[in-house]
Amino acid sequence: MKIILWLCVFGLFLATLFPISWQMPVESGLSSEDSASSESFASKIKRHGEGTFTSDLSKQMEEEAVRLFIEWLKNGGPSSGAPPPSG
């Protein structure tokens, strides 16, 4: 039992000698990863916003093309001689 106690005391002694010097490079590495992560996050938000705008615009253009096509069909469609709307 005394051996376990002495090993614990020795381990605590060693832990007081080396903790800060071994942890410093890890923290500096994390801070650079955090900044890269935040830049990546910002670019993803921007891309998502642009993609949402493009998606909404594409949806509106498709709806307009469908509306024009239905009007063309109502006005006689292929038998009217007018070309179908391009969209």
UniProtKB/Swiss-Prot annotation:
The lineage of its organism: Eukaryota, Metazoa, Chordata, Craniata, Vertebrata. Its main location: secreted. This is Exendin-4. GO terms for cellular component: extracellular region. It holds the Pfam family Hormone_2. It is found in: Secreted. GO terms for biological process: regulation of blood pressure. Venom protein that mimics the incretin hormone glucagon-like peptide 1 (GLP-1). It stimulates insulin synthesis and secretion, protects against beta-cell apoptosis in response to different insults, and promotes beta-cell proliferation. It also promotes satiety, reduces food intake, reduces fat deposition, reduces body weight and inhibits gastric emptying. Interacts with GLP-1 receptor (GLP1R). Induces hypotension that is mediated by relaxation of cardiac smooth muscle. Expressed by the venom gland. Keywords: Amidation, Cleavage on pair of basic residues, G-protein coupled receptor impairing toxin, Hypotensive agent, Pharmaceutical, Secreted, Signal, Toxin. Belongs to the glucagon family. The keyword Signal applies. Residues 24-45 form a propeptide. Transmembrane segments: none annotated. The modification Serine amide is found at residue 86. GO terms for molecular function: hormone activity; toxin activity. Residues 1-23 form the signal peptide.
